[in-house]
Regions:
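C-terminal capping/extension of enzyme domains
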Residues: 2-21, 31, 38-106, 129-130, ...
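Intrinsically disordered, low-complexity regions enriched in glycine and serine
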Residues: 23-27
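Short, conserved, surface-exposed binding loops centered on an aromatic residue
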Residues: 102-103, 176-180, 218
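Short, hydrophobic/glycine-enriched beta-strand segments
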Residues: 104-114
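Glycine-rich His-Gly loop
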Residues: 112-117, 284
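Internal, well-ordered interaction modules that form the hydrophobic cores of assembly/scaffold domains
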Residues: 114, 127-130, 137-143, 219-233
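Short, surface-exposed acidic-centric catalytic microdomains
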Residues: 120-205
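Internal catalytic-core helix/loop-beta-alpha segment
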Residues: 182-243
Length: 319
């Protein structure tokens, strides 16, 4: 009598039939390669039939996954910000060949920007932004006018109503530099090169300072350094010239802004008896510094920069 046990072993004939059906079903599957006209060779068929396709597909999938990851990473990575570089220092000695002057004015005041803005670099002009107050104030204090002061629509900037000189006193940029330096003033920047997206001092990264200490060693008549752009510039000056402060050669200016910015860095000897140069934190000339009006900024610069500087120039000429 035949056994009714469901766990009984399959007969060889039934097993062979099952294998044949499975093979037929597999043969009926049309792969994408076959639909595109690719007919696998016997070797390829044998390779796939043994299950090696699983590891092959896995490796391929992992490879493409890594490539996709690389593409995604490179496409989302922020573009590198190019380094920008400051101008060379400008003083009367650097202008003499252009002007034909026979005598060189000694430098008594070195005015430092932080680093040229996009507008300055594109125009190759220090303090080149049209609404930067620097050249407007220099003109008011030294007897010239920067330009007409009109915007793209032909309307005058607000600050032009406070200017001391009319259109007949407008000078070109080169002539402004010539007059400015002939009075013993010099221009440079704190930062020689840096990475910065935009023009804000706060966005400066990986900076390298200019050789300002060496400049002053070469110009022993320098009596004051003026930081033209406020707080961030002062912070960078302190960071890069801490040893200069510790040497005792520098002292804070007499205004409140300078004392606040520099007192803790200065070497306090007997009333700064060894100090040769005062460092002034000035009201910022930047158009972004809107806390003070143009008139307030000009008054500060006249009291602490141009007034004392012109007196020093007269004294130096008498030597």
């Amino acid at each position: 009598m035949a056994s009714s046990n469901p766990l009984r072993r399959s007969s060889p004939r039934r097993k062979a039939t099952s294998v044949a059906v499975t093979a037929a079903a597999a043969a009926a599957i049309v792969t994408p390669q076959q639909s595109a006209g690719f007919v696998p060779s016997p070797v390829t068929s044998r390779y796939f039939s043994k299950g090696a396709n699983t590891s092959k597909a896995s490796r391929s999938s992992r490879l493409f996954s890594e490539r996709d990851k690389e593409v995604t990473t490179s496409s989302t990575k922020k573009p590198k910000v190019e380094r920008t570089h400051s101008f060379q220092p400008v003083w009367h000695g650097s202008m003499v060949k252009k002007s034909g002057d026979s005598e060189v004015a000694d430098v008594h005041t070195l005015v430092l920007g932080t680093h040229p803005s996009i507008a300055s670099l594109s125009k190759s002009e220090m303090f080149g932004h049209t609404q930067n107050a620097f050249w407007w104030m220099a003109g008011d204090c030294l007897g010239f006018r920067r330009q007409l002061g009109l915007n793209a629509e032909g309307k005058p900037y607000k600050l032009t109503q406070y200017l001391r000189y009319d259109e007949s006193h407008v000078l070109s940029y080169e002539d402004q530099l010539q007059l400015f330096t002939s009075k013993g003033f010099a221009l440079w920047d704190i930062i020689k090169s840096c990475e910065r997206k935009g023009s804000l001092d706060a966005d400066i990264k990986n900076e390298e300072p200019n050789e300002i200490w060496d400049f002053c060693k070469s110009h022993k008549t320098v009596k004051r350094i003026v930081l033209a752009n406020g707080g961030t510039g002062c912070t960078m000056f302190n960071r890069h010239f801490r040893d200069w402060w510790l040497s005792g050669e520098l002292k804070p200016g007499s205004n409140a802004e300078s004392k606040k910015a520099f007192d803790k860095f200065a070497k306090k000897t007997d009333n700064f008896r060894d100090a040769k140069i005062e460092v002034i934190s000035a009201l910022s000339v930047s158009p972004a510094a809107a806390k003070y009006s143009y008139e307030e900024k000009r008054q500060f610069w006249e009291d602490y920069v141009y007034g004392p500087g012109l007196k020093d120039h007269e004294e130096l000429q008498k030597r």
